[in-house]
UniProtKB/Swiss-Prot annotation:
CDD domains assigned: HTH_XRE
Organism: Acinetobacter baylyi (strain ATCC 33305 / BD413 / ADP1)
DNA-binding region residue numbers: 18-37
Lineage: Bacteria, Pseudomonadati, Pseudomonadota, Gammaproteobacteria, Moraxellales
Protein purpose: Represses transcription of the PilB-specific inhibitory protein CpiA.
PANTHER family: DNA-BIDING PHAGE PROTEIN, TRACRIPTIONAL REGULATORY PROTEIN-RELATED-RELATED
Deleted gene: phenotype: Deletion of the gene results in a 100-fold reduction in transformation.
Stretches assigned to the HTH cro/C1-type domain: 7-61
Molecular function per GO: DNA binding
PROSITE patterns xref list: HTH_CROC1
Protein name: Competence pilus inhibition repressor
InterPro entries reported in the protein's UniProt record: Cro/C1-type_HTH (IPR001387), Lambda_DNA-bd_dom_sf (IPR010982)
Entry-linked Gene3D superfamilies: lambda repressor-like DNA-binding domains (1.10.260.40)
Keywords: DNA-binding, Repressor, Transcription, Transcription regulation
Amino acid sequence: MDIGRAVRFLRKRQGWTQQQLADFSHTSKSNISNLENGNQGYSPAILEYLAKAFNCSVSQIFLLAENMDNEGNLLKDWQHMPIDVLFIQLPQEVQCQLKHLIFTLIDTKK
């Protein structure tokens, strides 16, 4: 499992540069680069900042990493992935829209 590959995957899905992710996660561009390339470990604090930047949980980042191969490709087709892995891949605005839709559907069931 390589957290760096998952971070790169998520960053690219958001259309962000390493500098943008560094700004969002309160670290330097070189730290992001080193993390993505496996040249640096990660602290709980940086994982929390990254999760906040990606609007997800730390566990979702780990789950995504577990479902990636050594080249950073997803191992399974989307129909067999855990819902968290699918959700985290979506742009943040789509995640927000889906959350709103889900909460609306739940409220109508009450």
